[in-house]
A protein has these predicted regions:
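Positively charged n-region of N-terminal signal peptides that target proteins for export
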Residues: 1-4
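M16 family metallopeptidases and their MPP-like homologs
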Residues: 41, 46-62, 68-72, 87-131, ...
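Short, conserved secondary-structure transition motifs
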Residues: 149-155, 246-260, 367-377, 571-572, ...
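Alpha-helical scaffold elements lining the catalytic groove of polysaccharide deacetylases
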Residues: 188-193, 197, 642-645, 650
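Proteolytic maturation boundary segments
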Residues: 18-38, 219-260, 268, 303, ...
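A common structural junction motif
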Residues: 128-138, 230-238, 347-358, 585-592, ...
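Bacterial N-terminal signal peptides
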Residues: 6-15
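Non-catalytic, conformational "gating/processing" segments within enzyme and secreted inhibitor domains
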Residues: 145, 198-230, 428-429, 621, ...
C-alpha cells in the first residue's frame, strides 16, 4: 500500500534528473533574432515528440492585489488565438493522438504539447499562434474565472489539509513575491479584468521571455526550419520588469500557527524552514539531507516512525525555486498517536545527523537513487523536454541534466552537518498544527460575471502569417520491443520484454485472484497480504530487503487488488542478480512477521480514517459498494474487518494463491529472452503447487434509478459518481466502447467536458469511462460541481448520454476519434512500465498478448453503428446508481427534482 500522502509534489530538480556526468544529450541550442531561446533534443527511441515552452513568468509576477493571475492567465491561453478558435487546440490535437496541458510554478509557466513525431508542425504552429496573440473576451474570461474558482475550492477549500497546504507554500517565505499562492485567492481572481489579461500577455508572453524545447524523434534541420519560419517573425517585446532581488532575512524566533480544518479525520503537523535557491552551493547538501531522512523504506524517518507504527506519513521534502526554497517535515500520525511525539522524533533524527554525521554508505545510496530515478525521468519525450528546460532555466546549460550530478557526488557528511546547523535552527521553524474542528467551512464564493457583455474585436499583439498548420512530416513506424511468452515445466508463465536501450531490470510477479479469491467476510485481506509480501522473509527482515535494494538505487513493491496480488523489483541492469535473488526470496519465502502485520493494520486503519474525509473516496467507495452488492468488487474494507484479520488469515490466503500455475513473471529491460529464461529457471524451476481457479458470483440486477446522497455538512462542492454495470474485462467490445467514450467524456474535447466545463463552467473537470477488470466492469461518469448546479449538471450528463445513444456520430467525429486513439497508442506504450502493465492486464483478464498487435486494426474497424450499439447496450441511465457526496442542506432539494433521494450519513 502506498503511504497516505498529505501533499503530492512533483519535484523536478537537477539532482532528480541527473545521470552520469560523462553523458551528453544530442542537442542543438540557439537564439532567434527576436530573443527566443531554442533547444532541440533528439531521441529516436519512440516516434513521439514534445513541444515544451516555458515563459519566465509565474505566481511571483502576479500583480499586487491580484494573486492567482498567472494561473488564471494560463487558463486563458487555451481560449483561442488568431487562427485557433476557443478550445480549438484540443480539437486539433486529439484527432492526431496529441495532447496539450500547462502548469504554473512560482517562477515560470509551462505549456507543452505531445504528439506523434510526424505531427510536430501542428504543435509548433499552435504555440506560435498563441505566442503572437490571444483571443480575450468578457465571456471567456468569466468562464475561465469560474473554472479557476471551482478548481481552487476543489483543491484547497473543500479538501482535507487544503488550507494547511496553501499556508505551507506561502507563509514561510520572507521573499514577498513568494508569499502569494500560485492558484490565488478567490477575491483576487474575481478582480481580473480584460485589460489586465491583455497587458499580461503583452508584457510577459514575448519571445525574448521564453525558452522553446523540442524533444524526441526529430530531424534537426527540418525542425529548425519549422521553428524559424513560425516563431522567427514574431516581434521582440519590451524586456519584462525584473523581480526584486532576494535578500535573506534572519528569523528571530519560531512561528507557530494552528489551522482548524473541518474536513480532516487525522491531525497533521507541518514544519517548514526557508532555504537558499536551487542554484546555491548549499542546496545539494540540503537535498541529500532530505533524502537521507525520508526517501525509501530504509530511510531514517521511515525506520523511526513508520516501521514502528507511529506515523502514517513522515516525510522531509525540498521545495526548490529560483528564489528561496523550503525544507519541510510533513507528519501525519496513526490513530491515537500524539503528533508531539512525531515532531520531537523528527528533530531528534535531525540532531543525530548534526552530532554524528552521515556514513558514506548512506550518501552512496542517495546517489544511486538519483541515478536510477534519473533514467526513468528521461524515458518519455515530455520527461526529456522538462528535464532539459529545468537544466537550462536554473543553470543556463541543458547538459546539466547529466553534469548536475557532480554537485551531489561532492556532498560530504560535513557539508550536511553544516547546512543543517545553518538553515534548520529552532528559531527558523514555521510550525503548522492542523487540527479538527466542528466549525462550519466558509460558504462557497460565487465567481464574478459581467452583466452586460459587449462584443469586442480581437486585439492581437501579432498575427503569424501561416493561417493553417504546415503539413505533417513523414511518419515513423512504432517498433514494438521483442515480447516472448514461455512456460516453465511447473506451469509458471514467463514473459520477457526486451528493451536494450533501457539500462534497467524490472521484475514483476502477478498472482491471479486478489479480493475475488479471499474470504468475503474479511474485506481488505488481499490488500494487507499483498502489501506484506515485501516486508519480511524467512531469511530477511523488511529492513534487510529495503536496505539491500535501495543501496543500489532500486526499489521493491507489492500490493493486492480485486483481481490479483503482485510484487516487483526494479534495479539498474548491473544489479540483475540481486534483483532476481530478492524477487525469488519474497515470492517463495514471505513470512508475514507479526510486528509487520500490526504495523500494516495500524496504517490501514489510519489511512481509512483519513480517506473517509475525502469526498472523492467516499463517492467511489459508496458507488462500488452499491453497484456490486454481493460481489467481491463491492466488498469494501471496514474498520471492523481490519481489526478482525489475523496473521493466520494472511498466511493462509497467500499460500492459497502462491503457486506457479497461478502466476506470471514479467521481465523487462536490457535483457534477452534467453537470459531472462535462464534466471527464471535458476530461481523458480523447483517451485511446486497448484492453485484453485477464481470463480465469480452472479452480479446483482439493478432496476430503476437510485439516488443516494451522502451528507457532508459544510462541503462547498457536490461530488458525484453515476453509472451502471458495464463490460466483461476481456470482451472485444472494448474497442467500440473506447471510440464511443472518446467522444462522450474521455478527452478534453469530448462532449461532456465541452458542455459542462467549458460552456457552463460548472466544474473544473468531468470524465466518463469503462473499467475492465477480470470479471465485469462498470460505466461511470465522475465530477465535482458547485453546490448550486448539481441538478443542472446531472441533467446535462443525461442529455449527452441520450444524444450519443440516439444520434449517430458525424463522419468528422468518428474519424477524429479513431485517428486520435490510434495516435494515442504510442504514448500508452512509451515506457517500459507501460508494457509491463499492459502485459499484466492482459494476463489477469485472460486476453492473448497477440491482441496488442491487432489493437490498431480493431480501432480502425469501429463503425458509427458499433458506437450506437455499444452506447445502448452498456449505458442505462434509467437504472443508474447515482451517488452524490455533499452538504444535504444545500443540494437535497435539487436532487429530489430528479427522483427519490435516499439520505446516507457519512461513515
Amino acid at each position: 500500500m502506498k503511504r497516505f500522502v498529505l501533499l503530492m509534489l512533483c519535484l523536478l530538480t537537477i539532482g532528480g534528473a541527473s545521470l552520469a556526468a560523462d553523458q551528453q544529450l544530442d542537442l542543438q541550442q540557439y537564439v532567434l533574432d527576436n530573443g527566443l531561446e531554442v533547444i532541440l533534443v533528439r531521441d529516436t527511441t519512440a516516434p513521439t515528440v514534445a513541444v515544451d515552452i516555458w515563459y519566465k513568468v509565474g505566481s511571483a509576477n502576479d500583480p499586487i492585489g491580484k494573486s492567482g493571475f498567472a494561473h488564471l492567465f494560463e487558463h486563458m491561453m487555451f481560449e483561442g488565438s488568431p487562427h485557433i478558435p476557443d478550445n480549438g487546440m484540443d480539437q486539433l490535437l486529439e484527432p492526431v493522438g496529441g495532447s496539450s496541458n500547462a502548469y504554473v510554478s512560482t517562477d515560470y509557466t509551462a505549456y507543452y504539447d505531445t504528439v506523434p513525431s510526424h505531427q510536430l508542425p501542428l504543435a509548433l504552429w499552435i504555440e506560435a499562434d498563441r505566442m503572437g496573440g490571444l483571443d480575450v473576451t468578457q465571456e471567456n474570461l468569466d468562464n475561465q474565472r469560474a473554472i479557476v474558482i471551482e478548481e481552487l475550492q476543489r483543491s484547497y477549500d473543500n479538501r482535507p489539509y487544503g488550507t494547511a497546504v496553501k499556508a505551507l507554500i506561502t507563509v514561510p517565505y520572507s521573499y514577498e513575491p513568494y508569499k502569494r499562492p500560485a492558484i490565488g485567492n478567490i477575491d483576487d481572481v474575481n478582480k481580473a479584468q480584460i485589460e489586465d489579461v491583455l497587458s499580461f500577455h503583452r508584457t510577459y508572453y514575448v519571445p525574448n521571455n521564453a525558452t522553446l524545447v523540442v524533444a524526441g524523434d526529430i530531424d534537426f534541420d527540418a525542425t529548425r526550419a519549422l521553428v524559424d519560419a513560425l516563431f522567427g517573425p514574431i516581434p521582440r517585446g519590451d524586456d519584462p520588469p525584473a523581480l526584486p532581488e532576494f535578500v535573506p532575512v534572519d528569523q528571530e524566533e519560531a512561528e507557530y500557527i494552528t489551522i482548524e480544518d473541518p474536513f480532516i479525520n487525522l491531525p497533521a503537523l507541518l514544519v517548514a524552514y526557508e532555504i537558499p535557491p536551487l542554484i546555491h552551493e548549499d542546496y545539494p547538501a540540503l537535498d541529500v539531507l532530505s533524502r537521507v531522512l525520508s526517501v525509501g523504506d530504509s530511510s531514517r524517518l521511515a525506520k523511526r516512525l513508520v516501521d514502528t507504527g507511529k506515523a502514517l506519513q513522515a516525510d522531509a521534502w525540498i521545495f526548490d525555486n529560483r528564489g528561496p526554497g523550503q525544507f519541510a517535515f510533513i507528519l501525519v500520525g496513526n490513530v491515537g498517536v500524539d503528533l508531539a511525539e512525531l515532531e520531537e522524533a523528527s528533530y531528534e533524527e535531525l540532531q543525530r545527523i548534526i552530532d554524528e554525521g552521515v556514513p558514506q554508505e548512506e550518501l552512496d545510496k542517495v546517489i544511486a537513487g538519483i541515478r536510477s530515478r534519473g533514467i526513468l525521468g528521461l524515458e518519455t519525450a515530455l520527461g526529456l523536454a522538462e528535464s532539459v528546460q529545468s537544466a537550462s532555466y536554473y543553470f543556463g546549460d541543458p547538459q546539466a541534466v547529466f553534469t548536475g550530478v557532480d554537485r551531489y557526488k561532492a556532498v560530504s557528511s560535513e557539508d550536511i552537518q553544516r547546512v543543517a546547523i545553518e538553515y534548520l535552527e529552532e528559531s527558523d521553524r514555521h510550525v503548522f498544527n492542523v487540527v479538527e474542528t466542528d466549525a462550519e467551512a466558509p460558504p462557497p464564493v460565487e465567481p464574478y460575471a459581467a452583466e452586460d457583455v459587449v462584443e469586442q474585436e480581437p486585439d492581437y499583439r501579432y498575427v503569424i502569417e501561416q493561417s493553417e498548420p504546415p503539413p505533417p512530416l513523414d511518419s515513423n513506424e512504432f517498433n514494438f520491443p521483442t515480447i516472448t511468452e514461455n512456460v516453465l515445466d511447473n506451469g509458471l508463465e514467463v514473459v520477457v520484454i526486451e528493451q536494450p536501450n533501457m539500462p534497467i531490470i524490472s521484475l514483476d510477479v502477478y498472482f491471479a485472484g486478489g479480493g475475488t479469491a479471499a474470504p468475503q467476510d474479511l474485506p481488505g485481506l488481499a490488500g494487507i497480504a499483498g502489501d506484506l509480501i515485501t516486508r519480511g522473509t524467512t531469511a530477511r527482515s523488511a529492513q534487510d530487503i529495503a536496505g539491500a535494494i535501495e543501496q543500489v538505487g532500486g526499489a521493491v513493491g507489492s500490493g493486492g487488488g480485486g483481481d490479483s496480488l503482485q510484487l516487483g523489483v526494479f534495479a539498474l541492469i548491473e544489479d540483475v542478480d540481486l534483483a532476481f535473488e530478492l524477487l525469488a526470496d519474497m515470492t517463495l519465502n514471505a513470512n508475514f512477521p507479526e510486528n509487520e502485520v500490526e504495523r500494516e493494520r495500524a496504517e490501514r486503519i489510519s489511512a481509512l480514517e483519513a480517506n473517509l474525509a475525502q469526498p472523492s473516496f467516499v463517492a467511489g467507495r459508496t458507488f462500488g459498494r452499491l453497484l456490486y452488492e454481493g460481489h467481491p468488487y463491492g466488498n469494501a474494507t471496514t474498520f471492523e474487518s481490519l481489526e478482525a484479520i489475523t496473521r493466520d488469515d494472511i498466511v493462509a490466503f497467500y499460500e492459497s494463491r502462491r503457486h506457479p500455475d497461478n502466476a506470471v513473471l514479467i521481465i523487462a529491460g536490457a535483457i534477452t529472452t534467453e537470459e531472462g529464461l535462464e534466471y527464471a529457471t535458476q530461481h523458480f524451476a523447483d517451485w511446486e503447487g497448484s492453485a484453485e481457479a477464481v470463480s465469480y458470483p452472479a452480479l446483482p440486477e439493478h432496476s430503476g434509478r437510485q439516488i443516494l446522497l451522502v451528507d457532508r455538512p459544510g462541503s462547498t462542492q457536490a461530488t458525484f459518481r453515476i453509472g451502471n454495470i458495464g463490460i466483461q474485462g476481456a470482451s472485444l467490445d472494448y474497442f467500440p466502447a473506447r471510440v464511443m467514450n472518446h467522444v462522450l467524456g474521455g478527452t478534453f474535447s469530448s462532449r461532456l467536458v465541452q458542455n459542462i466545463r467549458e460552456e457552463k463552467g460548472y466544474t473544473y473537470g468531468i470524465g466518463s469511462g469503462f473499467s475492465y477488470p477480470a470479471d465485469i466492469g462498470y460505466f461511470r461518469v465522475s465530477a465535482d460541481v458547485r453546490n448550486d448546479v448539481i441538478a443542472p449538471a446531472l441533467e446535462e450528463v443525461f442529455m449527452e448520454i441520450e444524444r450519443i445513444q440516439t444520434e449517430p456520430l458525424t463522419d468528422e467525429e468518428i474519424n477524429d476519434a479513431r485517428d486520435g486513439i490510434v495516435g494515442e497508442f504510442v504514448f500508452g506504450l512509451e515506457t517500459y512500465q507501460d508494457f509491463v502493465e499492459s502485459v499484466a492486464s492482459y494476463k489477469i483478464r485472460g486476453v492473448e498478448l497477440d491482441r496488442l498487435n491487432k489493437w490498431l486494426g480493431y480501432i480502425k474497424d469501429v463503425s458509427k453503428d458499433d458506437v450506437l450499439d455499444i452506447a445502448n447496450s452498456y449505458i442505462h441511465p434509467e437504472d443508474f446508481i447515482i451517488v452524490v457526496v455533499g452538504d444535504a442542506s444545500e443540494i437535497q432539494e435539487q436532487l429530489e427534482t430528479l427522483g427519490e433521494v435516499t439520505l446516507l450519513e457519512a461513515e
